[in-house]
Amino acid sequence: MSNPRILIVGPPGAGKGTQSANLAEAYGVEHITTGDALRANKDMDISDMDTEYDTPREYMEAGDLVPDAVVNAIVDEALSQADGFVLDGYPRNLEQAEELEGMTALDVILSLDVSREELVDRLTGRRVCDDCGTNYHVEFNQPEEDGVCDECGGDLIQRDDDNEESVRNRLDVFDDNTAPVIDHYGDHDGFVAIDGEQTPDEVWSEIQDAVDAHTA
């Protein structure tokens, strides 16, 4: 199969973004994230959806949660335009998972498994370039010069939501809402659990084996 349809799931900090980028490049498919899809369709007319606002942009600018119905419509539009994809960041709950089943079939579902304490260490140690967004880590992905981005020379910062209290709250939200999605897909023929605590290269090797085995 030349253009696989891949879903990658896992908690914040599991490495979904890194491995999704690898998948998109290696298999020539589109990397679709909820955030990117929302930004690309922020002026979409949703006035017929009985929502508070008429466009996703208004929700985003107000800092309000975009309703599931709007997110579903935007993801559906993105998937309909993609010839093969890796979907990252959706579905976030069982209702969205049920909607996704009506949008497309999935060939492979990759679940990145990482322990909570490892996730806390990863996320609280993350540093992000304030200019270009490149990610670093205080332990295992340090810049050449402390506090300075290798790519653009910008300042490295800790995001406000990467402090320990916020991280643990985010993981609680994941456990409550998104972990049941992983259980939901457990019986899917293409479901593969990946040990996300390996090195990124080891994780990538295991992912390639899984995708190749389910899309041959």
From Swiss-Prot:
| Compartments where located | Cytoplasm
For this UniProt record, the keywords arranged alphabetically read as follows: ATP-binding, Cytoplasm, Kinase, Metal-binding, Nucleotide biosynthesis, Nucleotide-binding, Transferase, Zinc
The record's principal subcellular location, in a coarse class, is cytoplasm
Region annotation (NMP) ranges:
33-66
The record lists Zn(2+) as bound by: C129, C132, C149, C152
Catalytic activity, EC = 2.7.4.3
Q: Which GO molecular function annotations are given, in alphabetical order?
A: adenylate kinase activity; ATP binding; zinc ion binding
Q: Give the CC-aspect GO terms.
A: cytoplasm
GO annotations under biological process? AMP salvage
Q: What are the boundaries of the region LID?
A: 125-162
Pathway given in the UniProt record:
Purine metabolism; AMP biosynthesis via salvage pathway; AMP from ADP: step 1/1
The residues that hold AMP are T34, R39, D64, L65, V66, G89, Y90, P91, R92, Q96, R159, R170
The record lists ATP as bound by G13, A14, G15, K16, G17, T18, R126, Q198
InterPro entries xref list? Adenyl_kin_sub, Adenylat/UMP-CMP_kin, Adenylat_kinase_CS, Adenylate_kinase_lid-dom, P-loop_NTPase
Q: Which function does this protein serve?
A: Catalyzes the reversible transfer of the terminal phosphate group between ATP and AMP. Plays an important role in cellular energy homeostasis and in adenine nucleotide metabolism.
Q: Which family does it belong to?
A: Belongs to the adenylate kinase family.
What's in the domain note?
Answer: Consists of three domains, a large central CORE domain and two small peripheral domains, NMPbind and LID, which undergo movements during catalysis. The LID domain closes over the site of phosphoryl transfer upon ATP binding. Assembling and dissambling the active center during each catalytic cycle provides an effective means to prevent ATP hydrolysis. Some bacteria have evolved a zinc-coordinating structure that stabilizes the LID domain.
Subunit and partners? Monomer.
This chain's protein is named: Adenylate kinase
The organism encoding this protein is Haloarcula marismortui (strain ATCC 43049 / DSM 3752 / JCM 8966 / VKM B-1809)
